[in-house]
Amino acid sequence: YLNTNELLVQMKEVKSADSLLNQYAEEMQKIYASYVMEYQSKLADYQNNAATWSEVKRESVETDLGNLQIRISDFEKESNQKLETKKQELYNPILEDIKAKIKLVGEENKFTTILDGSAMLYVGTDAVDIMPMMKKKLGI
C-alpha cells in the first residue's frame, strides 16, 4: 500500500506546482479586483451625478455599467476554468510520474495489488508499505 497524500506532501514538485498555481490565482484575483474597482467607481459616479447628466450620457454610462457587469461575470467564469486547466497542466505530469513509479515498484517486487493507504481503515501486519520504495524511485 501507499499513502499517496503523504507522498504528495513530501514532493518538491508538488510544492513548486502549488506555488505556481497560487501565483496564477493571485494574478487572476488582481485582474478581477481591478474590474470590480472600475465598476464600483463608475457606479458611484453614476449615482452621484446621473441627475445632472443628459439622457444620452446617462444611457451611455448605464450601458457601460451593464457591459462591465457582464465582463466581470465572464471573467469570473473564465478564470475558474483557466485555474482548473492550469492545475491539471501542473499536476498531471506529477501524478503520471507517480503512477509510473508505482507500477515499476509493483512489477519489481511482484506485487499483485497496490492500494492507496490514505483510505484504508485497517492494515494487517503482512501488508507492505511501499513509501520507502517510492521515495527512492522519486528521489525524495
Q: For each predicted feature, which ranges?
A:
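Amphipathic, charged alpha-helical segments and their helix-to-coil junctions
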Residues: 1-140
